[in-house]
Design a protein with these regions (language model features):
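C-terminal alpha-helical "lid" subdomain
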Residues: 1-17, 31-32, 41, 45-49, ...
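A structured, charge-rich N-terminal accessory region that forms the first stable segment of a protein
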Residues: 16-17, 21-26
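Pre-Walker A (Motif I) flank of P-loop NTPase domains
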Residues: 27-34, 56
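Sensor-1/coupling segment of RecA-like P-loop NTPase cores
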Residues: 34-40, 120, 134-158
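Conserved catalytic segments around the Walker B and adjacent sensor/switch elements
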Residues: 52-65
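Conserved NTP-binding/hydrolysis module of P-loop NTPases
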Residues: 56, 69-88
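A short helix-turn-beta junction within AAA+ P-loop NTPase domains corresponding to the substrate/partner-engaging
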Residues: 57, 156-173
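Mid-core helix/loop region of P-loop NTP-binding domains shared across ATPases and GTPases
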Residues: 73, 84-141, 174-182, 194-212, ...
Length: 246
């Protein structure tokens, strides 16, 4: 199975459009805040990490233990990597480090920052406020990535924060067409329409499950091909006439 590919499924196309809407927005009229959300297993994190790598975006991932300080440290490290600079200044107060981040962001208005697992910030008003300050005070784009209820949670927690989001996309279950395209681009073996239909049905459109099934299918096909080739080689050896020594 080929690794690291970002296949142009429906979700990828729509998520790209959601980001491009912010890239082309009137910057003085709209802040660059967007939200990608959806059920588990639909490829949100895969999309976020791979599009960040392809387009040189800053990718940050929150954790259950994330704090405003750990976020600012992660942010300044990501910004320095984006600028190809070494040794980010990791000393000072949270506010001092964040101020350095803002200085660099203000100097590079085209920067795009993806914050994955935003759900972990919903119980931390200060952390949410830190992210809001980025889009309120700079022309940078910040894409939040969260679970299926992230949009509703954000609206409940802070109506004014929610109003700042100018682009949304909810990831949907993978279609048969999506899984067919993925199989065609990432598998190193040929498959039948019946096999792909079966994977789509049994995965229920969950991309994570579908990828596991595709991997198992590829492994099985390769094993069968290897067994067949070995048997054919043995048959060929048996049929090859032995030459008498001169």
């Amino acid at each position: 199975m080929k690794q690291g590919k970002l296949v142009r499924t429906r979700n990828v196309v729509e998520a790209d459009e959601a980001i491009n809407l912010l890239v082309t927005r009137p910057k003085e009229e709209m802040v660059g805040l967007g939200l990608l959300y959806g059920k588990p297993g639909l490829g949100k994190t895969t999309y976020a990490t791979r599009i960040a790598l392809q387009r040189n975006y800053v990718y940050l991932r929150l954790e259950a233990t994330s704090t405003p300080k750990s976020f600012t440290l992660q942010l300044i490290t990501g910004i320095y990597n984006y600028l190809n600079l070494e040794y980010p200044p990791l000393y000072g107060t949270t506010n001092a480090i964040f101020r350095r981040c803002m200085d660099e962001i203000e100097r590079h208005e085209d920067i795009v920052i993806i914050v994955d697992e935003i759900d972990y910030a919903f119980k931390q008003p200060q952390l949410l406020g830190t992210i809001r300050d980025i889009v309120d005070n700079t022309a940078a784009i910040v894409i939040l990535v969260g679970m299926q209820n992230a949009r509703d949670r954000l609206a409940q927690i802070n109506e004014y924060y929610f109003d700042r989001c100018n682009s949304f996309y909810e990831f949907e279950s993978a279609s048969l067409k999506d899984i067919t395209a993925i199989a065609r681009e990432v598998l190193e073996v040929d498959t039948s329409p019946e096999q792909i239909n079966s994977i789509h049905f049994n995965s229920g459109g969950n991309l994570r499950k579908a990828m596991k099934m595709l991997h198992l299918l590829e492994t099985s096909i390769k094993a069968e091909q290897g067994h067949s080739e070995t048997a054919e080689q043995r048959k060929t050896l048996c049929l090859t006439p032995k030459l008498s020594p001169i």
